[in-house]
Amino acid sequence: MELIAILLSGILALVSPVGLVLDRTVESAIRSRFDKIEQLQVRIDNAPNYQIVQGKVERVRVAGRGFWLTPEIRIAALELETDPLDIDVARLQKRGKAPVTTLLEQPLQGGLRLVITQQDINQALLSPAVTKRLSKLASRILGSSAELIVQRYEFVNPKIELLGNNRVRLQLELQEQGADKLSVSVETGVSVAEETKLQLIEPSVLVNNTPVPPPVVAALLSTLNDRLDLSTLDDAAIALRILKLDVNREQLEVAAFVKVKAPTAVPSVR
């Protein structure tokens, strides 16, 4: 959701107090919100100039490679194509620190495509900030059982291997203070059901190279598949629906439908 807000804040550079702004200004605004972007193209399908001044835009297309959110987190490729935008220009000019999602007159919809390579994933997993956020995310999705594990163990040396055919392998070590490390390997298929529910398919788990009994894995799988619903991550303004999830041996590709809701309780200042 943070990524969507970053892109939206860059797109809002379309409209300024002085009126019409060119594609390059939007490109520059998007670049300024990332640590680095290797390649970037922005195309704006213009409405008549007077409509753009009023905050109305037919369509915005953003495409590029090498989007670095931080020095550790890289997205290999990103494409975004929006439906028509309707921006509250007066509120935009007076926004201060207001969230970008409060600046829309009408809901904004669009298509998003992301590609992340195995190398990018493992580079990100080396960052303590990333592993900390993933631990919090696991606690949020899976509830108290995951939270107890996160509190008890330190996650060490996590590594992802993309196996192709929508299967992945996660290897890591669990370190409990004053105890030996536990080596954990999880291999599973992944898919998306009903556009929001992440499903684990035929998982296998090894702890210290010993297979976890199938009944235990089946019980864990039932619990996980009931709780891995991405809609729980929707915030009040941004919703995400997964249309495609493809994992090959080199990269993970996601295509999604994004909807940014227009504010209902914020009065217009026009």
Indicate where each model-derived feature is located.
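Short amphipathic alpha-helical segments
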Residues: 17-26, 113, 117-130, 212-220, ...
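Alpha-helical transmembrane signal-anchor/signal-peptide segments
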Residues: 22-37
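N-terminal beta-strand/beta-hairpin edge segment
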Residues: 35-120, 131, 135-177
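Hydrophobic membrane-insertion alpha-helices, especially the h-region
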Residues: 2-17
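Short, highly charged low-complexity linear segments
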Residues: 103, 118-128, 140-141, 229-234, ...
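A general structural signal for short secondary-structure boundary/capping elements
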Residues: 87-89, 105-111, 125-129, 216-219, ...
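Extracytoplasmic/luminal low-complexity segments enriched in Pro/Gly and acidic/polar residues
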Residues: 183, 188-270
